[in-house]
C-alpha cells in the first residue's frame, strides 16, 4: 500500500516533464526551421540574387538627366577670340566631415570672395549631409581650394561653363551676354544661341530620396552632348576698338546724350565695326543700364534729315524725270500745303545764284531744293525708290531687336508729306538701314544684305560654313550710282562737308545730316541729331562709314559734330587696309634766274 502511495504523485510530474521537453523540442525545431529558412534566404539574397538586387537598388537611385554641351566661342574676322567658355566647378561640403567649421569658413572666404565668413559658417553648420557652398567657381579658385586640402570640402565639375570675355567693352553691344547657365540673353549670344549652345546629351547619376544629385557619385554618359558651333563675326577688332575710341571722344567733346558709328563693306555687306556710346562691360552686364546695353545702330529709328536727300536724288535721276542739267530756282523758302519750308541756317545757302542743279542741292544741302525735286518726281516715284532701297523693311543683319523704321504708305501721306520726306522728315530709319542704302550707291546700285556673321566653326575647329555676300536686288542703275557718288564728292570738296570730312591723301565722299529729335508725335525743342555718312575712297569705295551724334551741345550740324569723326575713321580704315595716302606734293618755288 505504501509503495503504491509513493508512486502515485510521480506520474503528474513525469507527465509535466515530458510535456515541457516536447515543447522545448518543438520550439527548437521551429527555431531551427526558421534559422534554416533565414539562412537559405540570406544565401539567396546575398549570394544568389545579391548582384541582381544590388543592381536594382542602384537603378532605383539613378536619374536620367540632360546635360549641356560645351558652348561655342565667338571670334572676330581674323580668328581672335572675343568670347569663349571656360570650365566651371561647384564647391561642396560634406558637413559631417568638416572638423573646424570656423577655420574652414575663413579659409574658403579667402578664395570665394562672393561669400562672407558668416554665410559660409552657416552653410557648413547645416544639418544636411552635404551642401553646395560655391557655384560657377573659376578654375583658379577651385585649384586654390584644392590646395587647401580642407576636410569635407570637395570640387565637382559643372555641366555648363563660364563665359570668358578678354576685352569686356569691345563690341559689347554686338556680342551681348549670357545668363548664369550660359543661356544667350542679348546680342549675338542671343541671336545665335541655337548654334552656340549645341545639342544636350543624356547622363545617369545617383540621386538621394529627394531627387537631388549626389555630388560625389560618378555620372555615366548615355548620349554624348554635341558641342556648340563657334561663330566667326565680320567684326575687325582693330577697327572696332578705334571706332569706339573715336566715337567716345566725339560724344564727350559735344557733351552729347549718345552716339553710334558703323563701318560697312559696301561690296559684301559685312559689318566691320559697330559702336555705341554709352556702352558697358559685358563682364558686368548686371550692373549696366538698359541705355548702355542698347544697340542704337539697329534699334533706334530716327528721322535721317539731310542724309536722305541722296535717296530723293536717286529717285529723280533713276526715273529720268530729272537730269544732272535740270535747273531749280534757288530760293530760301517754299510754302506747300500751308507749311513753309526753309533751308537750314548753317551758313551754307545758295548765295546770289538764281538757279541750282541737283548737285548744288546735295552739296549745299538745300531743303527747299530737295522739296522741289520731290514735287517734280511725284509721290509714287519717291515711294517706290524708298522701298527699292529697303526703307521700312528689316535688314536682317543678324542682330536682335532690329527696328524696321517707318515709311508711311502713300494713302497716309498728307499734302506736305512729299516735300518733307524729300529732305528726310516724316519718315524714320535706322543707321544700319541708311548705311545699306549708301552701300548700294557706293557699289554701283546693288542692295546688299548687311551681315554680322562670317563663318561657322565646328567643335573640332573646322570651318563648316562660310557666309557669302547676298544681293537682295538692284536699287538703282550703275549710271545713277556713279552720278550720286560725284554729288557726294562735291559735298566734301565745296559743300557742307568741307573741310571737316576731308582726309588728306584720300578722296572722301558723303553727306551731312541734321534733324530734330522726334518724340511722341512731335519734335523736342532744342534737341537735334547730327550725322555724317559717306565712303572712302570716293571713286571706288572700300568702306561706308556712318557717325551719328544724338543731342549734342554747343553745335548741332552734322558737318560739325559728326564729320570730323567720319574723317578720322576713314583715314584709320584705309591705313589699316594697307592703302597708303597719296603723296601731296609740296608747292615748288622756281628759282629766280639771274639776267
Please give the residue ranges for each predicted region.
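Beta-lactam-recognizing serine transpeptidase/beta-lactamase-like catalytic domain environment
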Residues: 4-11, 83, 208-222, 235, ...
Amino acid at each position: 500500500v505504501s509503495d503504491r502511495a509513493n508512486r502515485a504523485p510521480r506520474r503528474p510530474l513525469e507527465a509535466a516533464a515530458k510535456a515541457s521537453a516536447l515543447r522545448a523540442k518543438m520550439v527548437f525545431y521551429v527555431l531551427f526551421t526558421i534559422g534554416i529558412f533565414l539562412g537559405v534566404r540570406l544565401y539567396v539574397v546575398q549570394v544568389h540574387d545579391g548582384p541582381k538586387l544590388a543592381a536594382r537598388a542602384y537603378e532605383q537611385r539613378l536619374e536620367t538627366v540632360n546635360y549641356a554641351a560645351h558652348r561655342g566661342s565667338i571670334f572676330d574676322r581674323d580668328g581672335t577670340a572675343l568670347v569663349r567658355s571656360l570650365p566651371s566647378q561647384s564647391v561642396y561640403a560634406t558637413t559631417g566631415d568638416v572638423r573646424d567649421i570656423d577655420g574652414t569658413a575663413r579659409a574658403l572666404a579667402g578664395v570665394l570672395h562672393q561669400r562672407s565668413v558668416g554665410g559660409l559658417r552657416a552653410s557648413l553648420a547645416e544639418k544636411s549631409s552635404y551642401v553646395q557652398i560655391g557655384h560657377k567657381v573659376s578654375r583658379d579658385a577651385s585649384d586654390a581650394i584644392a590646395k587647401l586640402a580642407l576636410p569635407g570640402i570637395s570640387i565637382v565639375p559643372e555641366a555648363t561653363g563660364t563665359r570668358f570675355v578678354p576685352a569686356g567693352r569691345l563690341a559689347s553691344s554686338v556680342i551681348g551676354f549670357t545668363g548664369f547657365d550660359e543661356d544667350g540673353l542679348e546680342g549675338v549670344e542671343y541671336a545665335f544661341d541655337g548654334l552656340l549652345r549645341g545639342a544636350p546629351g543624356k547622363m545617369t547619376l545617383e540621386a538621394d530620396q529627394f531627387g537631388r544629385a549626389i555630388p560625389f557619385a560618378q555620372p555615366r554618359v548615355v548620349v554624348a552632348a554635341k558641342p556648340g558651333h563657334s561663330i566667326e563675326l565680320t567684326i575687325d577688332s582693330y577697327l572696332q576698338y578705334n571706332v569706339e575710341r573715336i566715337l567716345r571722344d566725339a560724344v564727350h567733346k559735344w557733351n552729347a546724350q549718345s552716339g553710334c558709328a558703323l563701318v560697312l563693306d559696301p561690296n559684301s555687306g559685312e559689318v566691320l565695326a559697330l559702336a555705341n556710346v554709352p556702352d558697358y562691360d559685358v563682364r558686368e552686364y548686371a550692373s549696366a543700364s538698359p541705355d548702355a546695353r542698347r544697340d542704337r545702330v539697329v534699334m533706334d529709328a530716327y528721322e535721317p534729315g539731310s542724309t536722305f536727300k541722296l535717296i530723293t536724288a536717286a529717285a529723280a535721276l533713276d526715273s529720268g524725270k530729272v537730269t544732272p542739267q535740270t535747273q531749280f530756282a534757288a530760293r530760301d523758302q517754299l510754302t506747300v500745303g500751308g507749311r513753309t519750308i526753309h533751308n537750314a541756317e548753317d551758313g551754307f545757302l545758295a548765295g546770289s545764284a538764281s538757279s541750282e542743279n541737283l548737285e548744288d542741292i546735295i552739296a549745299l544741302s538745300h531743303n527747299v531744293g530737295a522739296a522741289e525735286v520731290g514735287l517734280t518726281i511725284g509721290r509714287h516715284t519717291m515711294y517706290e525708290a524708298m522701298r527699292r532701297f529697303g526703307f521700312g523693311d528689316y535688314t536682317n543683319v543678324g542682330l536682335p531687336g532690329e527696328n524696321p523704321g517707318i515709311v508711311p504708305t502713300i494713302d497716309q501721306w498728307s499734302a506736305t508729306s512729299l516735300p518733307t520726306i524729300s529732305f528726310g522728315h516724316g519718315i524714320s530709319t535706322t543707321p544700319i538701314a541708311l548705311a545699306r542704302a549708301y552701300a548700294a550707291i557706293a557699289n554701283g546700285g546693288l542692295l546688299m544684305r548687311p551681315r554680322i556673321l562670317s563663318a561657322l566653326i565646328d567643335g573640332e575647329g573646322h570651318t563648316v560654313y562660310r557666309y557669302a555676300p547676298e544681293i537682295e536686288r538692284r536699287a538703282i542703275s550703275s549710271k545713277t550710282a556713279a552720278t550720286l557718288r560725284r554729288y557726294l564728292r562735291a559735298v566734301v570738296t565745296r559743300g557742307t562737308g568741307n573741310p571737316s570730312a576731308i582726309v588728306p591723301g584720300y578722296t572722301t565722299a558723303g553727306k551731312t545730316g541734321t534733324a530734330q529729335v522726334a518724340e511722341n508725335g512731335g519734335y523736342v525743342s532744342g534737341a537735334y541729331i547730327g550725322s555724317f555718312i559717306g565712303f572712302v575712297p570716293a571713286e571706288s569705295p572700300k568702306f561706308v562709314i556712318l557717325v551719328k551724334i544724338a543731342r549734342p551741345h554747343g553745335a548741332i550740324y552734322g558737318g560739325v559734330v559728326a564729320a570730323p569723326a567720319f574723317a578720322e575713321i576713314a583715314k584709320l580704315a584705309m591705313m589699316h587696309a594697307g592703302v597708303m595716302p597719296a603723296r601731296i606734293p609740296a608747292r615748288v618755288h622756281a628759282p629766280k634766274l639771274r639776267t
